[in-house]
Amino acid sequence: HPLALATGAEEEIIIPDHTLYGVYPPKIAEDEIKPVNESGEIVLSRVVVPQTIVVHDGVPSNASAKNYYVPYRDYIKNVASSEIYATWPQSTIVANVLAIMSFTLNRVYTEWYRNQGYDFTITSSTAFDHKWIFGRNIYESISVVVDDIFDSYLSRPGVKQPILTQYCDGRRVTCPGWMTQWGSCDLGERGYSPIEILRYFYGDSIYINNAEQIAGIPASWPGYDLTIGTSGDKVRQLQEQLDAISGIYTAIPGVVPDGIYGNATAQAVREF
């Protein structure tokens, strides 16, 4: 469908198939709890809800795929609208939204892709993460649920990080130990509550937790201050964020993400 741009022109957006009937690669299995390096550099100091998610619209290795800066709630609503049906029971929608949010906040907390040298939070590939579709419509029943519980995630006793709650459709793909989307619909129709649905698939130790809210895009402190002359991935990450923000707030000068903290970067920081 056409999407209005700031210039007044329209861009033609092709919306691909929903994941429950389209053909997409199945999720590559991962451990639901990520190891923490002894240095502690892999994770943030606490679980937070970011204001913005940086979505890489492709597989991680596709350097030509675009990165989109998406408000967290809008991202979750988009993924849920792409992964499940809005006509399913509310308890099913809540359970699936919780799983989507917990998975996403695990990527945020562990800085999973940034620790691999990438400059994004999560991908739109179903093989690695969830399906996010640029420009798609959002369903009201899903939007209401996300607005109600957006600061929640799933935990296990003694585990600080949000659980990487993986799932599959349960018909074309089977995934023992994960939630199946069609199975969650069936349980919802049988009167199961959201936590009962989640415990049916992920086990009785799973529980719902709440995160702090935070503005911006969370990133762990690199162990040193970023000043004139500093270089590296953390500087490049800062520059990319400033450059994206400058497209909206024109008082902030654009910067080239070269990984070197020079005068142009310092000026952009001062304006910010």
Question: Which positions does each model-derived feature cover?
Answer:
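Conserved, single-site charged/polar hotspot
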Residues: 1-272
